[in-house]
Amino acid sequence: MKNAFYFFAVLLLLSCHHASQKGHTVSVRIDPDEAENSIAADEWLGTAGCALIPLADTEKPITNATRLKTHGGKIYILDEETHCLHVFHADGTLDFSIDRRGKAGNEYLWISDFHVTDERLYLLDHIGQKILECDTLGRFIRKRDIDGYYANGIFATDEALFLVNEGSTPEAGAFHVFQFDREGAFRNKFIPFNPDRGFGSSKEYDTDGQGGLLFCQAPDDTVFLVTPEGCTPLVHIDFGRHALPEKYHHLNLLEIMRKGLYRQYVTGINRIFGNGKLVFLQYHYGDDWNWIVYDRERQ
C-alpha cells in the first residue's frame, strides 16, 4: 500500500497549464512566490520497497561518499577522501573495491566520477585526464587519454561514451558534452557556452533514468537530453522577473553573494536528476530551496 510522500518547498509543474512553446522547446514559467509548502506525492512514490541496508565493512572505511549509484542490483559508492570505489550487493555485502591510486597506466590520481553499464565500468581520473575502462568486476581493460577535451563528469551507454565539461575551454572548444564511440573515436560535441560568463554556464547534469544524460545550462536554464542519437532541448525554465538580470551575468558567484543578488534573484538550477518520466530540478530563492517536478509525459 502506498503512503504519501511530501516534498517541502516544492512547485509541481502541470505542464498542460503552465507550459508554452519556445520554438520546438517546451517553456515553463516559474514564480517562486507561488511555490507550495508541501504536496502529496503518492502518485509518484511508494514505500513498499524501502529498507535500511547495512553495508559490510571495507578495508578502507568510507569517510566521504561523494557519489552513490545503483545498477544491475548493485550499489556503487565513491569515497573522495580515500579515492576508492566500493561495490556492494543489494543486501549490503561487499562485492569488490577499487583502490588503484598511482601514476601507472592502469592507476588513477583522482577519481571524480564513474559510470556503469551492463558491460563496463568507467572511472574518470579528473587530474590525470584519462579514463580507466574496466569490466563489471573492476578488472582493468584499457586506458583512454582525453587530453584536448577535458572532463569533470562521465556518462556512457553500450554504444557511446560522453565527457561532461562544466566550464573549461579545451582544445576541442567551449562545449559542455563531448561524444565518443565505444572504441574511443571522437564523434560529436554538444551545448556550446560562453567561457567569459562570470559564474559559469552550468554544472548540473545527471542521468534521465532511461539511458540518456540530462544537462541544464544557465543562464537560459534549458534542460537538454543527450543520447547516442544526438542532443535535444527538453524543457526551458523561465523564472521571469525573478531570474538574475543579464547585466549581472559577468559577475562571479562571490561578487553576486556580496551584492546580495543571491537572495534577490534565482541564479539558476542547482541540482537535477530524473527517473524516466519525471525530471527534478532544484533552485534557490530568498531563504528557500525549492524543487520543480517536470512530467515529461504531460507536454
PLM feature spans:
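C-terminal motif of bacterial Sec signal peptides marking the signal peptidase cleavage site
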Residues: 14-15
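Blade/loop signatures of beta-propeller domains
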Residues: 20-54
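Short beta-strand elements that form the blades of beta-propeller/WD-repeat-like
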Residues: 27-29, 74-79, 120-125, 159-170, ...
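Surface-exposed loop and turn segments in beta-propeller and other repeat-based domains
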Residues: 45-60, 96-107, 187-203, 233-262, ...
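Beta-strand-rich domains and repeat architectures in extracellular enzymes and scaffolds
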Residues: 49-83
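Blade-loop segments of beta-propeller domains
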Residues: 56-64, 84, 93-118, 125-126
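Repeated scaffold domains used in trafficking and secretory/extracellular systems
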Residues: 64-67, 109-113, 149-156, 198-205, ...
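Asp-box/WD-like beta-propeller blade repeats and closely related beta-sheet repeat scaffolds
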Residues: 109-110, 125-174, 187-198
